[in-house]
């Protein structure tokens, strides 16, 4: 027997698939019906198979902490996140706007430094950062684009609103896994 959606509760968390116990969101009904047809054992086997493929393909990421480089397998939930098209269109536009703002920030840091002069960000926070690259001062990349790609980690709050947990501009490795 599959998942009993009538008894399922996401507690205080927003659920992208289920709006209330037993009620799938319109755009997730097909997936919910399919998942409901699988037993817990079948779901577990599918997750294990995905984990094995990821490990065998060497899909991993490195956690850099305290001088250690720890390789970890890339986590993949076999249940996809389904996001309504209209909602995703809004999020995508916001992410594009965010990347433009990040590029403007980096360009300012390495050129005019208006953000420092205006007292918005303390000089020492930027200038003493181990990630601040003094040789980049004065560089003006084409169109002011320092980062062509950004890995923004999205989460939802309890009301279902998207929030950016962090932006990864250095090495947004997750994107390359999607290309694989």
Which residues fall in each region the model found?
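Preference for protein termini
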Residues: 1-180
